[in-house]
Amino acid sequence: RLNDLFKFSKKHKIKLASIEDLISYRLKYEKLISKIDTKTFFLNSGKFFLHNYRNKLENNVNYAITKGKFNVKNSIVVRVLSTRIKRDILKNIKILKSLKSLNKYKNFLLLIINRKDNAETSNINTLRYYGIGAQIIKDLKVKNMILISRSKKKIIGLEGFGLKIKKQIIVK
C-alpha cells in the first residue's frame, strides 16, 4: 500500500506526510485543551497538585494529579485512567487506588480522562482521547515517560507530540 502511495504522490507531484507529521502540525497550530487552574492538596502520603484542563471538543474537565518535580531530562512515571467523573475526584475509588499505588514513586503523573461516552463500548473516540491526554502530558513538561498500564500498549503517534515511552510497567 505504501509503495502505491509513493507512486501516486510522485506521479501527481503531491507530498506525503506521516501520522506523526500531521499530529505535530496540528499540535503546533491547534490546541484541544486549555488549563483552568492548579490546586495544591495534601493526603496522608504527602503534597500533590491537581491540574484542571478543559477539553475544548467536549467542553468537559480532565484532571492531572502530580507529585514531585518534573524535569524534561528525566523519565516521569505516568498512569492514565479513563473514566466518567460524576463527583469529587478525590472520592473516586479507582483514582484513590491509583494514587496509593503510584505513591511509591518520587515523581509521578496520574492523568484522568473524563469520558463522556462509555469507556468499555466506545473505540471511536479513543484516538481523540489519546490526543487530549498527550497535550495535557506535554503541557506539564513531560517528555519521557515510564507508562504504567494493565496491558502492553503500542500507542502510535506519540512522537508527534514530542513524547516517548521509555519503559512500560504492567500492573494488575
Residue ranges and their predicted role:
Residues 1-172:
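Catalytic domains of riboflavin
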